[in-house]
Structure formats: structure tokens, C-alpha cells
Design a protein with these regions (language model features):
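Non-catalytic regulatory/linker segments of enzymes
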Residues: 1-177
Length: 177
């Protein structure tokens, strides 16, 4: 890494150590530390997310999600698990933000550590967007139907809401722009 990035990563490391100590958490395993420099040097977002929530990095490590290629439905299954006890819009918004942050760190880490190629990274980002939008839509639609009744078309049939993913999402080409 260039010296400027090394200095930045050193500052991140110091802040991370303070956050870990303040929360009485354990430091990540040595194998993960070898990947930390290029990942944090390449992504301020990942570094700051880990500093803000040191348990995030530990959770990704313990779960094996940093080392594992996502299979079909893996992202959706993790989100479904996260949303089991969510019963209102405020908690849904919080859970979706936390899930997005966790998954974005996982995807970026795998990309920057050289554990995932371009196709995997683009696919994972697209899956994340797709399942998050779908989960939000399903819950919000159900809650609105409970409150106001299901919307009906001219023929009286219940109508669903639809979100169209076009462009990069529809083409499964979302990136970190």
C-alpha cells in the first residue's frame, strides 16, 4: 500500500482497537488480520463499519460468511432470519439498514481481499438489493393491507404492488459506485 494509505489504515486500526477494548470484545483471528490492511486501505466504508460495530467483523468471521461463496437463496435466508421478529415499519427500517451494512461489508471484504471475482461481487450486490427491496415490499404491503384492505383493480381482483429493477439491477450489474 502507498504510505498515505498505510497511515490511514494505522489510524483505523487504532480506532478499531479502542472500540474493541471499550466493548470488551476479542480481536479478530490472525488469518483475518492479514486481509485487513488491503481491505481497509481500499474501503473507508468497511473500515468505519468495523470500527463502529466491532462485533460485525467477528460475526462475519464466526459465521464463515467472509470465506464462503453465496449460494442461491443464501442472502434471502439470512435476511429472513434477521426479520423474524420485525413487526413494525421502524424496526423494519433498522433491521434492513443493519443487514445492508453487514452484507456490504461482507461483499466488499471478499472483493478487496481477492476472495471473490467480479461476477460474484456484482451478483452478490444485485442479490442484496433484490432481497432487501422484496422483503420491504412484502412486509409493507401486508401491513397496509391489514390496515386499509387490499387494493383492488377495476375487475375487483386484489392488486399487488410491483417494483421493477431495470438497468444495473435488472442486469445484475450493481457495483460499489
Amino acid at each position: 500500500l502507498p504510505q498515505a494509505l498505510r497511515s490511514e489504515v494505522a489510524r483505523y486500526w487504532q480506532a478499531f482497537g479502542e472500540a474493541v477494548g471499550a466493548g470488551n470484545r476479542e480481536m479478530p483471528p490472525d488469518a483475518l488480520l492479514a486481509q485487513l490492511v488491503p481491505v481497509w486501505g481500499g474501503s473507508e466504508f468497511v473500515a468505519r463499519a468495523c470500527i463502529r460495530e466491532p462485533a460485525l467483523l467477528t460475526g462475519l468471521t464466526v459465521s464463515g460468511d467472509l470465506a464462503t461463496v453465496n449460494g442461491p437463496g443464501d442472502c434471502a435466508a439470512r435476511l429472513a432470519q434477521r426479520l423474524i421478529d420485525v413487526g413494525d415499519e421502524g424496526r423494519l427500517m433498522t433491521a434492513l439498514r443493519q443487514f445492508r451494512r453487514r452484507e456490504m461489508v461482507r461483499i466488499a471484504w471478499r472483493d478487496l481481499a481477492g476472495l471473490a471475482g467480479l461476477v460474484e461481487t456484482l451478483g452478490d450486490l444485485s442479490d442484496l438489493a433484490d432481497v432487501a427491496v422484496g422483503a420491504a415490499l412484502d412486509r409493507l404491503y401486508a401491513w397496509q393491507c391489514q390496515r386499509y384492505g387490499a387494493p383492488r383493480g377495476a375487475d375487483g381482483q386484489p392488486q399487488r404492488m410491483v417494483v421493477l429493477g431495470m438497468g444495473k439491477l435488472g442486469g445484475r450489474e450493481l457495483n460499489f459506485s
